[in-house]
Curated annotation (Swiss-Prot):
Origin organism lineage: Bacteria, Pseudomonadati, Pseudomonadota, Gammaproteobacteria, Enterobacterales
GO annotation, cellular component aspect: plasma membrane
Protein name per UniProt: UPF0756 membrane protein YeaL
Keyword Transferase: no
HAMAP family with a match to the protein in the record: UPF0756
Keywords on record: Cell membrane, Membrane, Transmembrane, Transmembrane helix
């Protein structure tokens, strides 16, 4: 039996490798393994909890320098007195807000996820971008199409 979904996943994984987007490629390969094994029974759980777990892991990675001490408290305090750091804080707030809108949009309009993924892969492949923005991209899309 021909599995179109598997073919699409393989194509997206190939795009991930070609564009040096190993995060996307490895993620898709893991999903392929889940799909073709008895682990496929976990898909409802992955669909429900995957994004939350991913955000938790991402937050751990971002906060690790503070927790490890490699980013000393004095540096954090000084960030409130430098105009460039204040701009960075403001942009961080805006981007976090956009990411929140993106999560809502991806949950309510999952058909947009494929377009966001293809756009991210193309951005990495054609413009030497970095694959960090699907949630932010979804947030920007929500500003255009609405987040319902």
């Amino acid at each position: 039996m021909f599995d179109v979904t598997l073919l699409i996943l393989l194509g997206l994984a190939a795009l991930g490798f070609v564009s040096h987007n190993t995060t996307v490629a490895v993620s898709i390969l893991v999903l392929i393994i889940v799909r073709v094994t008895p682990l496929s029974t976990f898909f409802p759980w992955i669909e429900k909890q995957g994004l939350t777990i991913g955000i938790i892991i991402l937050t751990i990675g971002v906060m690790a320098p503070i927790a490890s001490g490699s980013l000393p408290p004095s540096t954090l305090i000084h960030s409130f007195f430098n105009w460039k750091s204040l701009v960075a804080i403001a942009v961080g707030v805006i981007v976090s807000w956009l990411g929140g809108r993106g999560v809502t949009l991806m949950g309510s309009q999952p058909q947009l996820v494929a377009g966001l993924l293809v756009g991210t892969v193309l951005g990495v492949a054609l413009f030497r971008g970095v694959p960090v923005g699907p949630l932010i991209a979804a947030g920007l899309v929500s500003l255009i199409v609405g987040k319902q």
